[in-house]
Amino acid sequence: MTIPFWQEKTLEQMTENEWESLCDGCGKCCLHKLMDEDSDEVYYTNVACSWLNDKTCSCKDYPNRFTSGEECLKLTRDKIDEFHWLPDTCAYRLLSESKPIPEWHPLITGSKSEMHAAGESVRNKVVYEIDVVDWEDHILNHPNR
């Protein structure tokens, strides 16, 4: 039996296609985050980037996402040490922490359907910036709520 590439290679050793395939397409990294100025704690909101399609959990303009004016961050191998802000289910983060990827990950199941069924995507769970008045009302992981 062949060992999956993500189990035998480090993130630095992966090809560009392998690297890109680690993204499960959950859309969580497309949610706006707020940072506590005192503690540097990162809080996820349910406020999505205006380019996120909330049905497919994909960018509406993926090829131009870094030049669209949005705050889309490119995940690169030289920034692995900064991956702590990614969702705790993210393959990039998990592999950078020497942890296994989830059983519902599309690399294991062959499709995104298991991820959506497990409730691990943002499908139909977001609001858009234009509809938000008080961003703090949209914090998902606030410790005091």
Curated annotation (Swiss-Prot):
It comes from the Bacteria. Coiled coil: none annotated. NCBIfam families: PRK05170.1-5, PRK05170.2-1, PRK05170.2-5. PANTHER family: UPF0260 PROTEIN YCGN. Belongs to the UPF0260 family. HAMAP family: UPF0260. This is UPF0260 protein VS_0923.
